[in-house]
Regions:
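Active-site cofactor/cluster-binding pocket
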Residues: 1-172
Length: 172
């Protein structure tokens, strides 16, 4: 996928308060903007300060409507497997879910995922971040995992550059 193409990408980024969902959204949206792509972002913050649900709607080269309709997201990036399950109804047939988990999503969802041809790619981002000595960087680990698949059309090198620009620690 050419990063400067007009292909629309609808992305749901979800997790619970304190997992860096807003930062992840900023990383992806700023990278897209720096590449000259159109970006629309909308965030909902349940009781995010108390560990509640946080959902960001990110459209790259999409319509100006702020929210992604249920059944139309191309990609979901979930810092929490429970939040991924709660928000599966946003996914379109043939979409891809990236989840911070060693096991993926609960096996009871397999028939639903198979029926809709939804691909689930899991990576234990929290465990990896802890192993690297920076537990708070689990969201960045998951972002790197997503970038490796180039599914958002955002080159890894550009994401690194954006990370350095927006992160206090990224420039150290």
């Amino acid at each position: 996928m050419n990063p400067t193409s007009t292909n629309e990408r609808k992305v749901i980024i979800t997790g619970i308060g304190g997992q860096g969902i807003v930062f992840l959204t900023r990383l992806f949206s700023q990278t897209a903007l720096d590449l000259g792509l159109g970006v629309v972002v909308s965030e909902t913050h349940g009781m995010s300060q108390r560990g509640g649900s946080v959902i960001s709607h990110l459209k790259i080269n999409g319509s100006d409507a702020p929210l992604i309709q249920r059944g139309s997201a191309d990609v979901m990036i979930a810092m929490d497997p429970g939040e991924a399950m709660q928000n599966l109804d946003f996914m379109r047939r043939g979409g891809t879910v990236f989840v911070n988990s060693a096991e993926g999503l609960h096996e009871s969802l397999a028939p639903h995922l198979e029926r809709l041809d939804i691909r689930v790619l899991n990576h234990p981002a929290t465990a990896t971040a802890v192993e690297l000595g920076s537990p708070a960087a689990a969201n960045i680990v998951l972002a790197g995992f997503v970038a490796a698949f180039f599914i958002l059309g955002l080159p890894y090198e550009n994401m690194i550059q954006t990370l350095k620009q927006i992160s206090k620690k990224g420039s150290e």
